[in-house]
Each structure stands twice: as structure tokens, then as C-alpha cells.
UniProtKB/Swiss-Prot annotation:
Lineage, top ranks: Eukaryota, Viridiplantae, Streptophyta, Embryophyta, Tracheophyta
Biological process annotations from GO: DNA-templated transcription
The protein, known as: DNA-directed RNA polymerase II subunit RPB2
Source organism superkingdom: Eukaryota
Region of interest: Disordered: 842-903
Family classification: Belongs to the RNA polymerase beta chain family.
Organism: Solanum lycopersicum (Tomato)
Length: 1191
């Protein structure tokens, strides 16, 4: 297309050739979110588990085969020589989520009911079971009886909300509202016992991948190559293989050759590599070297192998090599044949299982093993850098699917073991086998429930369990919920001060949000996904393998090792499948097929030209992201495609999947990204075409859809994050999760333990484009406040702010706070159960000192009751048996078990829910609401990590005002700006001013061409000072302020930390039982700790009496009687006024001393360990003298 064509009018014939603009890219992004939503990675992963993985696990399990233990019965001659029972599991079925009431009725379960009634949102799982009884006669004929049990119930599987088996799947907004659900709720979590649980993605190193690391010297080894090998089908724990090259100098100081040794699974010592080759059946040195070096002219590499060849010179055939390995196995003292068989088994089944575990895999294994050594040698020769542990291409994420898959596999195996045991018992005792009894559905039901409820992944109290995999979904704000659903965790110990894994790595660009990570010990280990990342669910490798076969891949049987250096090695999911002579054509074809969706779109194709490798990935857990495809410096997507996208009637036709299918967009994973050339903006692409001389690259292959999509959920809410110092964006990402807003639209129908709702939330005047996809406009969390930056009176020093009291009275940042209390009537035995009701002081023991007046006769406070600290809101009693109280019938017949309000809170009873739980027992939730009005000490923040507390509130008359009569709502100290460099806040302020004036929203999306100058000019046009300064007048005196004040609307957030929840003091109060020191914490009405540092200051001051008062009198003073002779604690009976020390038979020389109770406890604990701490109350010498006199 020529230059002049560019500027021709729209109705040209070449209309379809018109290029799109960066603005049009947002239409594409909208299409993505419309189709995918924000938690697609969770849903797809779970669906994969339900639809494929579960069936695979059941199919994988071998038949249960049982032979009766024959009881020797001499007189009785049986009809059959032997009987074999076989049980196997077939097709599985999952129904919609159901619940069984206590009376046995079943009904469809909806999430709302599960939340309110503390049920688990799970669906029953059924399986077809076939039982075969094979009877062998004495004459060798067989009789088989087959019995089919269809749809046997084997357990309940928790269902992820909005996944394809959920009752809410593909419901319209209207239906969702009628079901009491929030239409904006994204799903992606589970409901376990009424609480919402998220599975956090777990990061791990990718399996079947050769890594070579250089060891820090001095070390026994110079280089280590490792492969975590895991077969696709069997999900056994991966077997790791290490190949290590020893350092030149051994630990003793003598120079040993650089031997190379390998670790094999279940073998105690390291085995020289040459012996492994010989055990695989490659005996001649030439054959072995061919599998490692490929090229005999490479003398350097051959030389490195010399020591290893010499080391293994003594072993020259396969049997001896196998015996060498077998000798070092687990079992000791078996025959040679057994050892050889054992070694063969290990080489076949346990070594590199992903290459193959069948009979004739030796060639493939030898080649792969040779490849590992080849890589190790390349690294040792310095021809190739060591691998990077933190590269994101080497990482995989375990989402809900794989996590639940591993758990289900374990539980299903346990179930089959139990079935086997039960059937064996039945058969041995000659009973009939009833499969309904044999299959304990509780195994799977409670196993899955336990792991999801506690977050301990794996069996209860077993080793190798991971903690914190499932977490309670954060429902503070809508953004915090979304962010929690897109979080991922690296299971590295939090204590390790390792910097490397925590740093932002180049390969994380576009995959992980650079700003959103917690501060403190988990920094950089807990990450969040960027907006458009998709995590692959994995697809089968066989279509790829078939394709490679057709397109001229040569496998190991057909090739001679000499050709390997010239050809390109081909790997599929880390397994070396063969070589190819024309990789360029192969890659082009693969990509073409992928763009036509003939090959799954999530397949990754990585061509490493320098290494002559082509790596193809189809596995699960790779991060990938969509990019525009560029060919000949032009985007494949054109203006007309954008128009069809915008004009479509229904969301089903066209849309995102259509763009992918047409080959305009493709998903690129982290590793493939390094083989592409990506243009940052559409504009860069146009520039590269117009003047190729200045272009960064003349072969762009892809183009970013929009650079701002590298940010995650919380960082996408920040306006102009590209104008802030980077840690500020991190702080805001953390605070945005604590801002009050409307966390979900159906909060009236929910009984959350804690909930905060802002009275009058506003959408921000200054927005980012990504916000509309995060539904921040529908569910905002803040208010556009008029903010002045000024020192006014000095009550805004050190990050505090001055707030306008009149604005507060009008409802500025007023919020609701809900807290729910729950209780249930538990069964105490078979007959006795607890009862809700108003306790009667006459007959109930252990009643609280709070007020019981607010309760109705049913034991519940009715809605609309005003309650304050310690008032009882749920009355509950338990009957007590009459015979205690030492025989005499006590006047009490019941014991009090009521729930009272937290003592520091007041409010109104908002809603009471009385229902039954899964066991049919009555159970109640009471929600109390209170209004929180901003006051001194409450915490607020802007969207730029500028947090502050209210230092003072002034009424409107006392606030400064502008000529137009505007008074600010908030005054921030100017010292908050320079050192923190949050220029974004200043730009937001003047843009907000323009936006308010023109009645539009300001666009503050990062990496766009908005400049401060443009905004300033627009502000000037509106008739203001162009940099946002205003003349103001002092509210106290009415005089004009000498400085110009920077003023304008800025979006502020109210954070959940409020002074009413924190204020705490104590005069007297409860003490701990063990140490008799004051309790700890506000909730227990505890004391304030006078710690070691405070103690040191008092010592430095020399304030001895004060020190004694704090650490002794006010803490745990205690009086104890001590024997003067031996210095141990004596017995004192103060009633009878008698004292004695039995050890010394001393009844007179006894004194009383004052020591801390904790000290007395320590002394007694020492005595229990047979160490006698003696308290000598007078001089030792004197005591001896007296003893002499006494004698």
C-alpha cells in the first residue's frame, strides 16, 4: 500500500486494508473480558479436572483382584480349583450440586443456601462398578459370572462456583439476581461449610526439563544437571535424576579426574555414567560416546569424558554393570539373578519414566541420558550459560485442577485399598460381597472437604503436606476479591532471605503484575497475575507427535548419531522424540496450524536456533498471553474486523474466540515469547513501516494489545502509575484491598463475619481503561474529595490529614459495619441437646454479667434492638445432670452457653437467620450493624500509596476557601509529596479538575500519550490557573493566604483500620492462668507490655522504683516462704500459722520473700528437672556460723 493511500477517505475499495489504532485495541480487550471474565484460569482448570482428569484417574487404577486364602479342610473337596474375584471401576457420573436434608429428602443446592446454612457446595459422584467372579475347575475350564453395579455413589466433590457443573452456570443477570447472587460475582471459589475458599495457584519448577547449574566452589561437585522426570499419564511423584561432575580437586586436596556420576532412584550411591550406559546395553566405548558427543571431532568434549571412561574400565558387559547397580540397591544379601532383575526394573520403570516405562525404551533412554550429559559438558566447557532457576518459562503453576487431581488420586487409591480389604475379608469368611457396603463414600467426601477447609493439602497430619493452599476468600472490597482469585504463591520458605526468587524477573513481563506483591516477608514470593494472562490447562501430546511423524521427523531407530549435530533436536514436553533437517519449515507449519486452530491454541512452539533445538509444549500450568499477530510489518487484524466486533448483536457470535480462530491473535507463552519480536504499541509498528531506517526491528512478529495490561487487578485501578515511584504503586496495591466500598451487590442477603459498606461510593473522575473490566465503576470503593495540599494549622503533620467536619456531617465517607455471630444447638449425647431460649437466673448456673433483657423467649435478640458491649444476643443453655454437686441436688438444672456481643462494640441487630444445618439441628446467625462516622484517628488514602490518618476535623467555617467559595474536604501536608515522588497524584488532581469542569471522565491509563502540558492547557481553557493553583482565604481570620494552594478533586479511599476498632486501655483485668501476668490483646482486655527495650530505658534513667513497679507490682507480684537454711520453698499454713521445711526439719528459720510469680514457676520447673535453685536470704557465712552454734 502506497503512502498516499493512507490518507484517502473511508469509502475506498481498500477499506479492509485500513490499519487499526490503539483505541481500537480496547474493543478487542473488551471482547476478551466479555468472553473470559477475570477468573477464567480457575474455572477452566477446574473444568478440566471434572471432565477429564477424574475419569483418567479412575481408568488408571488397576482392577482389584482377590484370591481367597484357602482354609485347609481335609474332608471337604471343593468343586473348583480356585476362585478369583475381580472388581473394576468404569464410567463416572457427576450430578448437579445436591443436598440431602436430615429427613432424607434431596434437593438441588444453590450457593446462597450453602453460604447461609453452612453447607458444602458439592455434587455427588457416581461410578459404574463391574464385579467378575472367575471360577477355575480342576480340568482347567473357567466359568465367569459378571455382575454390573451402575452408578454406585462414591463421594461428593466440591464444585467451583460458575464452573460448568455449577447451578449458576451461564445464567442471565436476571436469573442470578432472583437466586440471590451478585451478577458481578466472578465465581472461581468453593463453598465449604458455608465459608468461601479459594485455591491459590502454586508455583513449581517444570518437570521433564534438563537444568544445569554451576556449584559455588569449594564444593565436591563442579556442575550438576538435574531432571525432574514425570510421566504424563501416571501421576506418581516425579523421580529426580542428578548427573554431577566432580570438581577438579577432591575434598582431600588431591587432584582426581573430573568424574561424572549419576544418581538413580532407589540406589544408595552415585553410579558412574559409563556403567549406566553399559547396564542399558551399550557396551562399546564408541557407542557410548556417540550417544553423548555425537561428533567425534569435538576433542575438548571427548577429553572431559576420559576420566569417566577410565573409571568404568573394569566393567565391560551388561550383566556385570547391572549387578554393580543392583548391589547398591535397597535390598542386601539376595542372589545375583535377583540383583540383576532389580537393577533392570529400576532402569526400566524408575529412571527417566517420562521417556518411557515400557520394554524397549533403552535406545531412547540412552539418547536422553546422553543428552543430559551433553548439556552438562557444554556448560562445563563454557559454551553455554547455566540455566536460570527463576526464569518463568521454567516454572509451572498448579491451579485448582492439578491440585484437586493429585488429592483425588490419593483418596481414590485409598478407597480402592479399603474396598480390597473389605472384599478380601468377605471372601475369606465366605460371606456375600455387597459393593454398596464395600465402598465408603466418606473417604472421598471428607478427604476433599478437609483439604479445602483447612488448606493443608494432602492427608491429615502426614508429611509432605503443604499449608495455606486454600484460603478464605477475601471479601473486603470487590477488587480484593478479584485479586485473591488471581493470586499465586511460591512455596519457598518465607524465612530464607534469598533475594533472587523475590526479584522481578525479565521473563515475568506481561505475566505477573510488577507492582502487586505484599510488603515484608512474603515480598516477591506471593504474586498476582497480570490482566490478560491465561494459564494453560494442558492438552494431549499425540496430535503433535502424529504431525511430527508426518512432517519428516526422524526417530532414533532411523538415524546414526553422526547426523545429530547437523540436525535440530525435537522435544515434546521435555521428551526428545527425534531430529529434523528442516526446522524452519516445521515451525512455520506448526504456527500456521495453531493460528487456524487445527492445533490447540495453547500449544507453545519454541525454536532455539543457537542450540539447534525445537521445543514443543502442550502441558498444563504455563503462563501465556494473547498478542496481535504481525506479518510484513502489518497487523493481521484490520479496521473492518474491529467494526464487525463492535456491531455484533449477540455476545455468542463473533467475539474473542473468533479473532483467535481467524488468526489475528495468538497466545504466546513465556518461553516462546523469547523467540518473538514484539512491537510495544501499534504506533511503533506504523513508524517502523514509514521510516524503516530508524526502526528498532524490521521483522516484528507480534504486537502488544496494550502495554498497560502488564498490570494486575489492584494496580490497574491506579491512575498514572507510570508517574509514580515504583514502591508507591506496590503500597497502593496493598491498600486498595482494604478500601471500603460495596464488596458485592447482594450484601443484604449475606451473613459475612465482617463486612464494610460505604454509604455513598462514587466512581472516580479520573479512570483507567482497565477499570471498566474490573467493574470498578459499578462497585467503586471511594469518593472524589476536594483536596488541598497545604499546611493549615499544623494538624496534618507526619501523614495526617485535616478533614472538613461539615462534609462528614453531610455523609462524607460514612460507612456501615456488619458483624455476624453464629451458634448452633449441638447434640451433647443421644438424648440431650442444647436449647436456644432465654436463660432463667434462678435455675441456670454460670450466667454472664451482661444483660439478658434484649432476648425474646426464643433466645434471640429481635432485629431492630439496640445492643451494646457484653449484651447477650443469642441465649442458649444445656441441661446438666442432677447428681453432681457432691450428692446434694443443686438448684441449677441448666448451664449457660450464650453468645454475647464483643465488649467494645455497639450497634443494632440487623438480621436474624434461624435455620437448620446439614444434620437437621437448629442453627442461628445474627447480624449486627453499626454506623461508622469518620473521626480523628481513622485511616484514609489516595490511590498513590499516600496513606494518612485524620489529625483534626474543622467545620466548614474554619476551613480555607477559594474565590469561588469552594472549601476542601481534605487538606494534605505538602511534605508528603517531594520525597515520595507520587507525581501521579498531582496529575490526577489537575485532570480531575478538568474532568469535573467538562463533565467527562479523565483517562489516566498508563503508557498513553497524555502529557501534563495537554492537561494544563485544557485546565487553562476552563478558566483556571494552568497548574491547578488557587488563591485561598484563611478560614479563621478571613485574610488571604500568602501562598497559592494546589487544589482539586482527588479520589480518596477509606481504609478498614478505624480507631474504634483499635482503641484500648486497661487498668485492672484478667491474668493468664499459668504465669499470672496480665493477658494479651484488646479482645481479651489485656495489658500493654512493658518490653525489654522499655526496661533498658528505665535502667538507663536509673528509675529503680518505677522499674520495680512496672515489672513486679503491676505484673505478677507473689509472696513465697523460704527456708533460711536450705534456701528452698517451705510449706506455710497461714491459717494455723505454722511453717516448716521438711527437708531440713526446720520449723523456725523461715522467711517470706516477694518474687514474681513467673520466677516461682521457673524455680519449680527447674526443681522438677532435679536442679535446686536456692534462694539465700542471708549471708552464707552467717548461716554456717549459726549452724555451728546450733550444733
Amino acid at each position: 500500500m502506497d503512502m498516499e493511500d493512507e490518507y484517502e477517505p473511508q469509502y475506498n475499495v481498500d477499506d479492509d486494508e485500513e490499519e487499526i489504532t490503539q483505541e481500537d485495541a480496547w474493543a478487542v480487550i473488551s471482547a476478551y473480558f466479555e468472553e473470559k471474565g477475570l477468573v477464567r484460569q480457575q474455572l477452566d482448570s477446574f473444568d478440566e479436572f471434572i471432565q477429564n482428569t477424574m475419569q483418567e484417574i479412575v481408568d488408571e487404577s488397576a482392577d482389584i483382584e482377590i484370591r481367597p486364602e484357602s482354609q485347609h479342610n481335609p474332608g471337604h473337596q471343593s468343586d473348583f480349583a480356585e476362585t478369583i474375584y475381580k472388581i473394576n471401576f468404569g464410567q463416572i457420573y457427576l450430578s448437579k450440586p445436591m443436598m440431602t436434608e436430615s429427613d432424607g429428602e434431596t434437593a438441588t443446592l444453590f450457593p446462597k443456601a450453602a453460604r447461609l446454612r453452612n453447607l458444602t457446595y458439592s455434587a455427588p459422584l457416581y461410578v459404574d462398578v463391574t464385579k467378575r467372579v472367575i471360577k477355575k475347575g480342576h480340568d482347567g475350564e473357567e466359568v465367569t459370572e459378571t455382575q454390573d453395579f451402575t452408578k454406585v455413589f462414591i463421594g461428593k466433590v466440591p464444585i467451583m462456583l460458575r464452573s460448568s457443573y455449577c447451578t449458576l452456570y451461564q445464567n442471565s443477570e436476571k436469573d442470578l439476581t432472583e437466586l440471590g447472587e451478585c451478577p458481578l460475582d466472578q465465581g472461581g471459589y468453593f463453598i465449604i461449610n458455608g465459608s468461601e475458599k479459594v485455591l491459590i495457584a502454586q508455583e513449581k519448577m517444570s518437570t521433564n526439563h534438563v537444568y544445569v547449574f554451576k556449584k559455588r566452589q569449594p564444593n565436591k561437585y563442579a556442575f550438576v544437571a538435574e531432571v525432574r522426570s514425570m510421566a504424563d499419564t501416571q501421576n506418581r511423584p516425579p523421580s529426580t535424576m542428578f548427573v554431577r561432575m566432580l570438581s577438579r580437586t577432591s575434598a582431600k586436596g588431591g587432584s582426581s579426574g573430573q568424574y561424572i556420576r549419576a544418581t538413580l532412584p532407589y540406589i544408595r550411591t552415585e553410579i558412574p555414567i559409563i556403567i549406566v550406559f553399559r547396564a542399558l546395553g551399550f557396551v562399546a566405548d564408541k557407542d557410548i560416546l556417540e550417544h553423548i558427543c555425537y561428533d567425534f571431532n569435538d576433542t575438548q568434549m571427548m577429553e572431559l569424558l576420559r576420566p569417566s571412561l577410565e573409571e568404568a574400565f573394569v566393567i565391560q558387559n551388561q550383566q556385570v554393570a547391572l549387578d554393580y547397580i543392583g548391589k547398591r540397591g535397597a535390598t542386601v544379601g539376595v542372589t545375583r539373578e535377583k540383583r540383576i532383575k532389580y537393577a533392570k526394573e529400576i532402569l526400566q520403570k524408575e529412571m527417566l519414566p517420562h521417556v518411557g516405562v515400557g520394554e524397549y525404551c533403552e535406545t531412547k533412554k540412552a539418547y536422553y541420558f546422553g543428552y543430559i550429559i551433553h548439556r552438562l559438558l557444554l556448560c562445563a566447557l563454557g559454551r553455554r550459560a547455566e540455566d536460570d532457576r527463576d526464569h518463568y518459562g521454567n516454572k509451572r503453576l498448579d491451579l485448582a485442577g492439578p491440585l484437586l487431581g493429585g488429592l483425588f488420586r490419593m483418596l481414590f487409591r485409598k478407597l480402592t485399598r479399603d474396598v480390597r480389604g473389605y472384599v478380601q475379608k468377605c471372601v475369606d469368611n465366605g460371606k456375600d460381597v455387597n459393593l454398596q457396603f464395600a465402598i465408603k463414600a466418606k473417604t472421598i467426601t471428607s478427604g476433599l472437604k478437609y483439604s479445602l477447609a483447612t488448606g493443608n493439602w494432602g492427608q491429615a497430619n502426614a508429611a509432605g503436606t503443604r499449608a495455606g493452599v486454600s484460603q478464605v476468600l477475601n471479601r473486603l472490597t470487590y477488587a480484593s476479591t478479584l485479586s485473591h482469585l488471581r493470586r499465586l504463591n511460591s512455596p519457598i520458605g518465607r524465612e530464607g532471605k534469598l533475594a533472587k526468587p523475590r526479584q522481578l524477573h525479565n521473563s515475568q513481563w506481561g505475566m505477573m503484575c510488577p507492582a502487586e506483591t505484599p510488603e515484608g516477608q512474603a515480598c516477591g514470593l506471593v504474586k498476582n497475575l497480570a490482566l490478560m494472562v491465561y494459564i494453560t490447562v494442558g492438552s494431549a501430546a499425540y496430535p503433535i507427535l502424529e504431525f511430527l511423524e508426518e512432517w519428516g521427523t526422524e526417530n532414533f531407530e532411523e538415524i546414526s548419531p553422526a547426523v545429530i549435530p547437523q540436525a535440530t533436536k525435537i522435544f515434546v514436553n521435555g521428551t526428545w522424540v527425534g531430529i529434523h533437517r528442516d526446522p524452519d519449515m516445521l515451525v512455520r507449519t506448526l504456527r500456521r496450524l495453531r493460528r487456524r486452530v487445527d492445533v490447540n491454541t495453547e500449544v507453545g512452539v519454541v525454536r532455539d536456533i543457537r542450540l539447534k533445538e525445537l521445543r514443543i509444549y502442550t502441558d498444563y500450568g504455563r503462563c501465556s498471553r494473547p498478542l496481535f499477530i504481525v506479518e510484513k510489518q502489518r497487523l493481521m487484524i484490520k479496521k473492518k474486523d474491529i467494526q464487525t466486533l463492535q456491531q455484533r448483536e449477540s455476545p455468542d457470535e463473533g467475539g474473542w474466540h473468533d479473532l483467535v480462530a481467524k488468526g489475528y491473535i495468538e497466545y504466546i507463552d513465556t518461553e516462546e515469547e523469547e523467540t518473538t519480536m514484539i512491537s510495544m504499541t501499534i504506533n511503533d509498528l506504523v513508524q517502523a513501516r514509514l521510516n524503516p531506517g530508524d526502526a528498532y526491528s524490521d521483522t516484528y512478529t507480534h504486537c502488544e494489545i496494550h502495554p498497560s495490561l502488564i498490570l494486575g487487578v489492584c494496580a490497574s485501578i491506579i491512575p498514572f502509575p507510570d508517574h509514580n515511584q515504583s514502591p508507591r504503586n506496590t503500597y497502593q496495591s496493598a491498600m486498595g484491598k482494604q478500601a471500603m466500598g460495596i464488596y458485592v451487590t447482594n450484601y443484604q442477603f449475606r451473613m459475612d463475619t465482617l463486612a464494610y459498606v460505604l454509604y455513598y461510593p462514587q466512581k472516580p473522575l479520573v479512570t483507567t481503561r482497565a477499570m471498566e473490566h474490573l467493574h470498578f465503576r459499578q462497585l467503586p470503593a471511594g469518593i472524589n474529595a476536594i483536596v488541598a495540599i497545604s499546611c493549615y494549622s499544623g494538624y496534618n503533620q507526619e501523614d495526617s490529614v485535616i478533614m472538613n467536619q461539615s462534609s462528614i456531617d453531610r455523609g462524607f465517607f460514612r460507612s456501615l459495619f456488619f458483624r455476624s455471630y453464629r451458634d448452633e444447638e449441638k447434640k451433647m449425647g443421644t438424648l440431650v441437646k442444647e436449647d436456644f431460649g432465654r436463660p432463667d437466673r434462678a435455675s441456670t448456673m454460670g450466667m454472664r454479667h451482661g444483660s439478658y433483657d434484649k432476648l425474646d423467649d426464643d433466645g434471640l435478640a429481635p432485629p431492630g434492638t439496640r445492643v451494646s458491649g457484653e449484651d447477650v444476643i443469642i441465649g442458649k443453655t444445656t441441661p446438666i445432670s442432677q447428681d453432681d454437686a457432691q450428692g446434694q441436688a443443686s438448684r441449677y438444672t441448666r448451664k449457660d452457653h450464650s453468645t454475647s456481643l464483643r465488649h467494645s462494640e455497639t450497634g443494632m441487630v440487623d438480621q436474624v437467620l434461624l435455620t437448620t444445618n446439614a444434620d437437621g439441628l437448629r442453627f442461628v446467625k445474627v447480624r449486627v450493624r453499626s454506623v461508622r462516622i469518620p473521626q480523628i484517628g481513622d485511616k484514609f488514602s489516595s490511590r498513590h500509596g499516600q496513606k494518612g490518618t485524620v489529625g483534626m476535623t474543622y467545620t466548614q467555617e474554619d476551613m480555607p476557601w477559594t474565590v469561588e467559595g469552594i472549601t476542601p474536604d481534605i487538606i494534605v501536608n505538602p511534605h508528603a509529596i517531594p520525597s515520595r515522588m507520587t507525581i501521579g497524584q498531582l496529575i490526577e488532581c489537575i485532570m480531575g479538575k478538568v474532568a469535573a469542569h467538562m463533565g467527562k471522565e479523565g483517562d489516566a491509563t498508563p503508557f498513553t500519550d497524555v502529557t501534563v502540558d495537554n492537561i494544563s492547557k485544557a485546565l487553562h481553557k476552563c478558566g483556571y490557573q494552568m497548574r491547578g493553583f488557587e488563591t485561598m482565604y484563611n478560614g479563621h481570620t478571613g485574610r488571604r493566604l500568602s501562598a497559592m494552594i494546589f487544589l482539586g478533586p482527588t479520589y480518596y479511599q477509606r481504609l478498614k483500620h478505624m480507631v474504634d476498632d483499635k482503641i484500648h486501655s486497661r487498668g485492672r483485668g484478667p491474668v493468664q492462668i499459668l504465669t499470672r501476668q496480665p493477658a494479651e490483646g484488646r479482645s481479651r482486655d489485656g495489658g500493654l507490655r512493658f518490653g525489654e527495650m522499655e526496661r533498658d530505658c528505665m535502667i538507663a534513667h536509673g528509675a529503680a522504683h518505677f522499674l520495680k513497679e512496672r515489672l513486679f507490682d503491676q505484673s505478677d507480684a507473689y509472696r513465697v516462704h523460704v527456708c533460711e537454711r536450705c534456701g528452698l520453698i517451705a510449706i506455710a499454713n497461714l491459717k494455723k500459722n505454722s511453717f516448716e521445711c521438711r527437708g531440713c526439719k526446720n520449723k523456725t528459720d523461715i522467711v517470706q520473700v516477694h518474687i514474681p510469680y513467673a520466677c516461682k514457676l521457673l524455680f519449680q520447673e527447674l526443681m522438677a528437672m532435679a536442679i535446686a535453685p536456692r534462694m539465700l536470704t542471708k549471708d552464707v557465712k552467717l548461716a554456717k556460723d549459726q549452724k555451728k552454734k546450733g550444733a
